């Protein structure tokens, strides 16, 4: 008897080839039959009229902390994702000496906007080394599959202590780090990650440890993986355009050519008004790198990356005197004060204290430390997930009110009102150009990070609803391949990403006509009551992970069949 049969579905198998109708039989966590299945099964799913596809794979997340308290793997799980890779950009929770645990947590808060109180309340910190961290993840109950990099900043701090934040590594330091990378890869690390991004800073506003490293150190650490013929090098790139970015990319190509290891960087993105637009240079660079013999990938997402503001999380004005006083109150009392004409006048007048807008990224958290006057022509009052929203500036002109008054009115009418400020990828045709490039990977949700600032976890359902259904820029078969097989191949997950006999039974069942993300809302559901943005999806009927039904119509079944996925160098 089979464990599970998905009957009457239309299979989009991840290869990019045409769809077909068939049943899928599952036993012992594997796909064992595809066709007209007559054998009985303990469970059956009727997928008539629905698509059956491989589970989606997200290679750029920061779920390192969240996996400790969230069995379901939200929000990724609601968008058809069955496998995530964490430890990106050099940020990880291991290796870490016990005395430095809070410092590591504070760094994740500073860089990735993961609330400190959630980490302190939600992590039962049982590990010190990276292999011990993997062993902990392996034992945790989890609905999804997890793989992880060993992170450069964590490794550097572990070996060098506070010297890691200001000094080049000595030969002895590098030798110790090389051994740790080899140990991690043998234990199952997907590879080694780092960051050179100027936006990545510590709680003291100094560069994270990986940004201090000289290239000879990076050469040695990626070279350690080359000696084992295993492991991927992922790096958060130099984000400025121009000579600095080009020098970084040229050096990165040399690492790929010298070591032969796969190298990933990103996200590749486009910024409105930037000339020349660096994303085009990066795509050309990928072509040149591949032609030279490098194994090189750029990561990109399917939509704009946004700062999201809401009454229940951050607002651009939170550091201003009268706003600070009001925002310290419970939401109901905030609304009462905001409705008071005298208080409203003070809140509006406070906006004049804000610094002029500049070209620096203005994410949600930055509102509390470095307030900049919003560009109301680029701040949207979100009404639906189709992104056809009015700007605050247009509403202010229409109503004859100050933009701050308009925002207050909208929040009083709906305390869940969300405002969206695109940071990059404002040009949708530019995004399409990136998605169509043969050496980009459709990933980079950043799930688990920026939990009150951004909402990238919906990229998979956005791909299906916007780029496939609304824009018809991809066939469903093409889009599913980008979310499944292409990512499985890049991360060397050799038994996932296709609906094939013998492959792991990671599957998603969805309605191609209705699948889409829902509106984001703010929930106080993190450990310690910390808040985050939550975005679910419609149109996903079921998700199977290693043969067990993990979700039915978006609701968790309680099954926790997720596994720790190990890299190809695992002993």
Regions found by a protein language model. Give the residues of each.
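Histidine-rich, glycine-flanked metal-binding segment
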Residues: 1-5, 11-55
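Active-site neighborhoods of metal-dependent hydrolases
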Residues: 133-137, 143-145, 149-156, 162, ...
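Di-metal (Zn2+ and/or Mg2+/Mn2+) metal-binding site signature of metallo-dependent hydrolases
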Residues: 51-75
